[in-house]
Amino acid sequence: MKIQLIAVGTKMPAWVKTGFEEYQRRFPKDMPFELIEITAGKRGKNADIARILEQEGKAMLTACGKNKIVTLDIPGKSWTTHQLAQQLESWKNDGRDVSLLIGGPEGLSPECKAAAEQSWSLSPLTLPHPLVRVVVAESLYRAWSLTANHPYHRE
């Protein structure tokens, strides 16, 4: 199973790239984890936000292909580390690749939300999108370590 993190935004601070890549490289070869960045629509004082969301959403869904789609969204379901490990196993047993979607400043398009089979909430707080990339990478690596009996996660 391959996991894709599809995120709106291409100009992230260096610490985001470093943090994401630190966990990305730890994933096993049979579970590659890749980041796909979607160029954010141009926002300005008179920007048509609905149109921008639609364009970003279309690009995200195209990148997903036939993968299982999981959105990252505040109203989604929150999981403990053990529950995330169970989700990871369930996704693996499903036999499909998984695309996790992180929206831009205004969130995800209605089309992305409608296409999602699951929605995952990291927190009821609004988190900066660059930080979410690193938190998701670490959380998934920790969940994988539980399923593989790797010593990374400690109770």
Curated annotation (Swiss-Prot):
SUPFAM superfamilies: alpha/beta knot (SSF75217)
Entry EC number(s): 2.1.1.177
Pfam families, sorted: SPOUT_MTase (PF02590)
Major localization listed first in the record, in broad terms: cytoplasm
Location(s), subcellular: Cytoplasm
A GO cellular-component term linked to this record: cytoplasm
Alphabetical UniProt keywords: Cytoplasm, Methyltransferase, rRNA processing, S-adenosyl-L-methionine, Transferase
Residues reported to bind S-adenosyl-L-methionine: L72, G103, L122, S123, P124, L125, T126, L127
Any one GO MF annotation of this record: rRNA (pseudouridine-N3-)-methyltransferase activity
Top-level lineage group: Bacteria
Catalytic activity field: pseudouridine(1915) in 23S rRNA + S-adenosyl-L-methionine = N(3)-methylpseudouridine(1915) in 23S rRNA + S-adenosyl-L-homocysteine + H(+)
Entry's family note: Belongs to the RNA methyltransferase RlmH family.
Primary role: Specifically methylates the pseudouridine at position 1915 (m3Psi1915) in 23S rRNA.
Subunit: Homodimer.
HAMAP family linked: 23SrRNA_methyltr_H
NCBIfam families: PRK00103.1-1, PRK00103.1-4, tRNA_RlmH_YbeA
Protein name: Ribosomal RNA large subunit methyltransferase H
Gene: rlmH
